């Protein structure tokens, strides 16, 4: 424990909180344009072809974003909305594309967890 004199001299430095989604610049979402849409393979114990897109954000930064859900309509030059949220088994993927916003279509035939995939309520 420091003495009062040491605190007078130095003071206490506040802890620096490091953001997990730096490219969003403290915004909840950011608009961007897809520059490349492709698939990648996940880390060791898992095996799949995960759909990802390289997105140039409106603030000038370029990020890799995951496309959640089954099937998508994205291609080069598609306008997308990007939110934070990493994909654990894809190194370097720290952002996700919001389904049902801008050029991204919602997931078809989605019954549960619809709001996450931009799916509207099914009509009876």
UniProtKB/Swiss-Prot annotation:
It comes from Clavibacter michiganensis subsp. michiganensis (strain NCPPB 382). GO terms for molecular function: rRNA binding; structural constituent of ribosome; tRNA binding. Belongs to the universal ribosomal protein uS12 family. HAMAP family: Ribosomal_uS12_B. The gene is rpsL. The lineage of its organism: Bacteria, Bacillati, Actinomycetota, Actinomycetes, Micrococcales. SUPFAM superfamilies: Nucleic acid-binding proteins. This is Small ribosomal subunit protein uS12. InterPro entries: NA-bd_OB-fold (IPR012340), Ribosomal_uS12 (IPR006032), Ribosomal_uS12_bac (IPR005679). Signal peptide: none annotated.
């Amino acid at each position: 424990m420091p003495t009062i004199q040491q605190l007078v001299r130095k003071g206490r430095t506040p802890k620096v909180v490091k953001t997990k989604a730096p490219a969003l610049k403290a915004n909840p979402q950011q608009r961007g344009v897809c520059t490349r849409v492709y698939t990648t393979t996940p880390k060791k114990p898992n095996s799949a072809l995960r759909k990802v897109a390289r997105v140039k954000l409106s603030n000038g930064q370029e990020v890799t974003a995951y496309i959640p859900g089954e099937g998508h309509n994205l291609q080069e030059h598609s306008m997308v909305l990007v939110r934070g949220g990493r994909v654990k088994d894809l190194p370097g993927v720290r952002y996700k594309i919001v389904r049902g916003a801008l050029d991204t279509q919602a997931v078809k035939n989605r019954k549960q967890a619809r709001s996450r995939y931009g799916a509207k309520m099914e009509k009876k």
